[in-house]
């Protein structure tokens, strides 16, 4: 086997031929690669001299000629050998070179431009535009794994050497967000979520107008970038599901008008503080409504979460009351009315304790608390009766030991009609599968909403109290919606169920009016003597009723007689006073 030896002169000649061949290949039109972006200080042109620093601290002058390898006909390393097996193994196998020609730049001067240590090579891609060459750093190949320290150092250098435009583009790339509704590019934070312009405008039109969208399919249409206009109903449903809401804004984005309102509120609070300090020195006849509003604003009831509201209402539920029913005694009109009125009178005592534990109720004045109870007591008793009777179709569970059906109610004149309405309401609750949490919310709504529009006075204080009641009602309504959403109902089902429950409250109000009229007729006929607290409640309801203001003179005479009667120890006002005295004594002890 013979081996051909080349002299030094022939080796230099071979080097020049290789360089000429490679440069000729790069000058062909089909190998021109357009620049991806403008050259910066990091990109070196062929007619310029640049110095690059590497982690090792060595420098390399690019003014010298760099060896270029781009021909696919040459191979300087056997592909079967692993990396690092020879001094030439640091190069790519040129049979598998990337589309752009590669320049290997040595980080320190070597004896020969062909021989480099593999840890000293950094690949760069050549870029050609109008005959001037530039270069950009290429991603390291799979087998090029610098140490972690060098990699972090190199990243810091590249970040510090990038221009301002590059850094801004990287920042905008990191801030790219997508629409929560259709997954398109988000244009900003609209109505509480990141959304695109199309979904923002669609939601704005939907909440401003009266658009009753109907899904032609099953209310489960796919809403994405391409199909968001196919179904308006499902698109609006998804807007609500992802959290879009009217008035939803980012906390860090407040317009000038909102900041102005905030400053006005702060100035108003400061004036309220001055007014309260002045009030101690010189008390006036009228209480400042601003001071009262500031106190109501800090009420604990308005800061409760939905779960806390439900827990408070469940804990406030009154205990079970048993009747004095004697199975051996047959029913007649007098015995049944005596049994029911006695049971109602004892339930009223527990109702007062329950109302005082409803969040926000004790923040009202004593007059307003009594007024609401006088307007709602029979509605509250009836909804409790209907709730207990849900599991007993065709019967009414007045107490655990008193279960009556429709036929038993016939012994009292006019009772069958009320029985039928109560049984129908219980069947409706049973069909809707009313939950205990929903029941306590409905009962609280009845208490707070019963007399909110019947305040006789129109002073600033009463108007402020009415506004506070509305805010507590909104809080309980939000709790109802939270319970429905928690049960897994869709948005449309939540709206439908909420409307159905609130419509039942109007039916309960109608039953209460019928029951109040029947009870008043029984009192006028002297069929049964009414107990003190129940009698006071009945008379108070008659006084607050609109029809009572234009009643006949005979009814006026009856009311005058009732008004001049001595106050009972079981009266509502005295019960409140006695309970407050007991609480103060317990606190003192």
Swiss-Prot record:
GO terms for cellular component: chromatin; cytoplasm; nucleus. Residues 245-304 are annotated as: Hinge. It comes from the Eukaryota. PROSITE patterns: NR_LBD (PS51843), NUCLEAR_REC_DBD_1 (PS00031), NUCLEAR_REC_DBD_2 (PS51030). GO terms for biological process: cellular response to estrogen stimulus; estrogen receptor signaling pathway; positive regulation of gene expression; regulation of transcription by RNA polymerase II. Pfam families: ESR1_C, Hormone_recep, Oest_recep, zf-C4. In the absence of ligand, steroid hormone receptors are thought to be weakly associated with nuclear components; hormone binding greatly increases receptor affinity. The hormone-receptor complex appears to recognize discrete DNA sequences upstream of transcriptional start sites. This is Estrogen receptor. It comes from Gallus gallus. The gene is ESR1.
């Amino acid at each position: 086997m013979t081996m051909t030896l080349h002299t030094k002169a022939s080796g230099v000649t071979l080097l020049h031929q290789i360089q000429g061949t490679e440069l000729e290949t790069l000058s062909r039109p089909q190998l021109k690669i357009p620049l991806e972006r403008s050259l910066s200080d990091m990109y070196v042109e062929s007619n310029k001299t640049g110095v690059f620093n590497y982690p090792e601290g060595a420098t390399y002058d690019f003014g010298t000629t760099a060896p270029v390898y781009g021909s696919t006909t040459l191979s300087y390393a056997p592909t079967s050998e692993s990396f690092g097996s020879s001094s030439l193994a640091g190069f790519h196998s040129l049979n598998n070179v990337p589309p752009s020609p590669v320049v290997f730049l040595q980080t320190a001067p070597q004896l020969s431009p062909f021989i480099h240590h593999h840890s000293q090579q950094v690949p760069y891609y050549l870029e050609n535009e109008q005959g001037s060459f530039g270069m950009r750093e290429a991603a390291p190949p799979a087998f090029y794994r610098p140490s972690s320290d060098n990699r972090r150092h190199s990243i810091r250098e590249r970040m510090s050497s990038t221009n301002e435009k590059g850094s801004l583009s990287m920042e905008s790339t990191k801030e790219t967000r997508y629409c929560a509704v259709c997954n398109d590019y988000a244009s900003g934070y609209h109505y509480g979520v990141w959304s695109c312009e199309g979904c923002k405008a669609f939601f704005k039109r939907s909440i401003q107008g009266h658009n009753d969208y109907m899904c032609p399919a099953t209310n489960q249409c796919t809403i994405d970038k391409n199909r968001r206009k196919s179904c308006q109903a499902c698109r609006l449903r998804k807007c609500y599901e992802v959290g879009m809401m009217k008035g939803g804004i980012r906390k860090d984005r407040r317009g000038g008008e909102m900041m102005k309102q905030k400053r006005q509120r702060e100035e108003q609070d400061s004036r309220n503080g001055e007014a309260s300090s002045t009030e101690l020195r010189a008390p006036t006849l009228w209480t400042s409504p601003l001071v009262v509003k500031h106190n109501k604003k800090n009420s604990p009831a308005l800061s409760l979460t939905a779960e806390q509201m439900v827990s408070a209402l469940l804990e406030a539920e009154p205990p079970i009351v048993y009747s004095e029913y004697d199975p051996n005694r047959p029913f007649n009109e007098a015995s049944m009315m005596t049994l029911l009125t006695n049971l109602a009178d004892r339930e009223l005592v527990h109702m007062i304790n329950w109302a005082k534990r409803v969040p926000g109720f004790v923040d009202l004045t004593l007059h307003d608390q009594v007024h609401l109870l006088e307007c709602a007591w029979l509605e509250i008793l009836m909804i409790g009766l209907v709730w207990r009777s849900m599991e007993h179709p065709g019967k009414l569970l007045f107490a655990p030991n008193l279960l009556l059906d429709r036929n038993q109610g016939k012994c009292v004149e006019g009772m069958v009609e009320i029985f039928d309405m109560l049984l129908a309401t219980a069947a409706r609750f049973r069909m809707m599968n009313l939950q205990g949490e929903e029941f306590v919310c409905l009962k609280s709504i009845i208490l707070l909403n019963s007399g909110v529009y019947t305040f006789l006075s129109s002073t600033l204080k009463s108007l402020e109290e009415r506004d506070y009641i509305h805010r507590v009602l909104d809080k309980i309504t939000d709790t109802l919606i939270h319970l429905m959403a928690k049960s897994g109902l869709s948005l449309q089902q939540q709206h439908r169920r909420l409307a159905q429950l609130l419509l039942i409250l109007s039916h309960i109000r109608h039953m209460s009016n019928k029951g109040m009229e029947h009870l008043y007729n029984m009192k006028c006929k002297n069929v049964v003597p009414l107990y003190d607290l129940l009698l006071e409640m009945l008379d108070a309801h008659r006084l607050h009723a609109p029809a009572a203001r234009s009643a006949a003179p005979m009814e006026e005479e009856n009311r005058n007689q009732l008004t001049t009667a001595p106050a009972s120890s079981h009266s509502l006002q005295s019960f409140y006073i006695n309970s407050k005295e007991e609480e103060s004594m317990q606190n003192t002890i």
